[in-house]
Amino acid sequence: MPQPYELWWSVVPGPSQLVEQLTAHLVRFESALIPYTTASFPWGEEFRLSAYDRVRQVHPNLTEELCDASTMGERSPGRWVLDVVGRGEVFCLPSDDPIEIAAESGLLKQRIFWVTHFTSKAQVAEWVAFAKALRKKAADHCCCVVLLLPTSLRINSHLPELETDAFFGEYDLSFFASFLLSHRKLSQFEKKYLSELASALSFGDAVQCAELASVGKELLEEPEQLPMLRAIPNHLHGIWLAQIRTVFSHIEETKFAIVQQHRNAIAALLHTTDDFGIAIEQMEDIELRHLIHAVNHNIISLPERTCTVINALYNSRNQLAHHRILP
């Protein structure tokens, strides 16, 4: 049995929906991961104070005021609480140097998932900087930074800054993808693939999902060879494979949605040249671009000459007459 993982997250008021979702995923992946159920998380005052005494032994300068401040307010890297799921401890990190305190108290010795909510883009930027600093500090350990962003705060430009083991996304898929990426035995190819897949799923990039689908299927051809499966007990392999296939199923649904979205135009393309010209001339630029991607990435299958005409139209659309027959 491998060393049980530990989940860390910044405290939210009460057992929120996010906590319940994360717990459900953890319980499904590995029963040894956490001994609690969603109904028995120790959120009470008695638990918090007893944990405070334990933390003070590690860092004597920790004040009760800082611990009390953890009951909420701003959840920035300077004032926060870490719940150690499975050990029943709470670490309250003071605002001067939370990374240093985390290192001194041994918090970086296990795989760590940092999960939080955001209310502004400024908070996102602050956590990006903090995550980068943490990664540098914990270079010899296996840390995984997970930032869960609401749709309104998704910022693509931050993704590369956090390297391949960080992920912005929806609650369910983000945790799954990040959990996979935390495995140190993954090859660089697999890490890069899973990171890109997570990004595509998160930001609704249907085209990128389609591009990654074929790569993902190759990973599943010989699942027993996957490092991520060798790192966990045999009896859990089926669960992991089911979850991976669920992600790929999501990609297939995305591809199907593209076809459905443009089904009328696609049907028109398969008729006479005149009808074909009328149909594509009436398509918006973005629709035509989606259609081209769908063809080029084998999402749909069209005759070769039809594909040639589609690309020619897209490249020289402004110079075409309404019924002009393309070479």
Region roles according to the model:
Residues 1-107:
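Extended, compositionally biased accessory segments flanking or bridging domains
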Residues 21-30, 38, 52-53, 95-112, ...:
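Amphipathic alpha-helical interface elements
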